[in-house]
Amino acid sequence: MKPSKFSISAVPPFNLDLSARIFADGDPQIRKYENGRFWQVLRNDNSLVLLTIESSGEVENPELVVEVRSKEEIASKNLKSISNMVINIFNLNMEINPFYVEVASDDIMKRIICRLQGLKNPITPTLFEALIDSIVEQQLSLKAAHSIENRVIKSFGPSISLDNEIYYAYPTPENLAFLELQELRNCGLSFRKAEYIRDLSLSILNHEMDLEGVKKLDKTEGMIDELCKIRGVGVWTAEMAVLRGLGRLDALPADDIGLRRSISHFYCGDVRISSDEARQIAQNWGKWRGLAGYYLIVADMMGLNIDN
């Protein structure tokens, strides 16, 4: 089927290279950023589509070119829906300048922002995906967790074949709810995590857990409290889920070892800090503390030296 193409403008500033760089080590059959191109399979109207996204603008005048490929004809109404998904995934409508103004008195953060101008935090297509990933990542290194996540996706997610390449989409609750626990464990999950994932999927299908209702809550704290009612979901998991799945930028997963390490690297001379100490430092960032934490993680990942 002939691919469809369209352009999307983003609220400036926006830098695709910085914003998608977190996917540079991704699995090319699932989601990856390489040589200025990002691609991922998504669901649209019960069909799978492969998106390829490239930048055609500048940081202060950002524009993206999106190519959509599918096995089926894509209706114009579905292209609009796909456009909205791209806007959500890369947070294209977010006004980021107020964040820069808010933290301008923090000299360290100000210097990091100068190097990462236009970085926006990606958001998962669904809250379910953010929850599952956060459960998988409990008490694991990111490398180990991503390996397990990829195995879950390739084992149970739907796939699409295009030009002799197979691509996989994230599993839905329907894909996971009725699995044998051993099937999930074969992906590298512990027995408990396999239980949590299957039980969460089943509770969504049985309408016992309403993730859409969680999204409609006004306050981040209420969202976290609601998610913590799910078996296997504690405060850290819920904070990670609302930050990466709903873009709640006031959520700071201070119990995260990687985040504390990045905060310490830039603010405390790499001395180990506690969750409370991380929260104390984060008070400087107000309602933007989750985004500020993300900037620190990316800066640390890139090995930025802000002393020069």
Please give the residue ranges for each predicted region.
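HhH-family (HhH-GPD) DNA N-glycosylase catalytic core used in base-excision repair
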Residues: 1-308
